[in-house]
Amino acid sequence: MARVPFIAGNWKMNPPKADEAEVLVKELMPRVQGIQKVEVAVCPPATALTAVGRLLDGSSITLGAQDMFWADSGAFTGMISPLMLADVGCKYVILGHSERRGRFGRPDESLGPDATRVFGDTDASVNLKLRAALRHKLTPIVCVGETLPEREAGRTDDVVGGQIRAGLEGVTPEQVAGMVLAYEPVWAIGTGRACEAPEADRVCGLIRRTIQKQFGEAAAAAVRIQYGGSVTDSNAHELLSQPEIDGALVGGASLDAARFSHIIHAASVIARELRKG
């Protein structure tokens, strides 16, 4: 069975107000109404999840969150639990994004010299979150990717493979088959410098082979692997045409309904072409 392309918008800390998030969703919904052969999700800030979820109810667009803690409840100031996300209607949750791991694509002086310790997610904490999400029927979007120094040192495959092996420890092949993995080279995120499509495809293929070795052929064939990192309406078609890339995790371009819908339509067109082929 062919994998259904999956386009997800990671809005990050945008827009600042819930009513602005509602406006963005209202602009997006008619642009993708009736679209086929592709799944779409948006991941707004936590403060807008309820408002956006109400608007999406009954639509073809699903709701996702940008992160979560692994405990269901307790004395964890500032955290959001998987139960809370399920309660507001989330289907997806992004886990292990490089910005949560403290790995940024470009310097941000506002973060100061300790930027790498702002959030500090590790493979171990991502794994705890992953298993908690699965317990509560949330579909994880697990992000992996290398920094520029790691790429220049020829360590891309080791870094990405290691993140997959450690992050997915203790889960079953059936669970892996139903989740989403996202290759996001850290040096491409928010920089306007996307990974070249053939290289993105190569690394996504590496991810699939890593899954095959760890979880078997069926899981590797079923798991969807997105590319993320400066995906735009200009480069989406080339990226999404690659055989190992099953969708995109879109940052800045997802904040513009016209640009985001263009990416979604590109995925739909490619899926229809592949089906005909």
Q: Model regions: which residues?
A:
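Active-site loop-to-helix "anion-binding N-cap" substructures in soluble metabolic enzymes
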Residues: 1-277
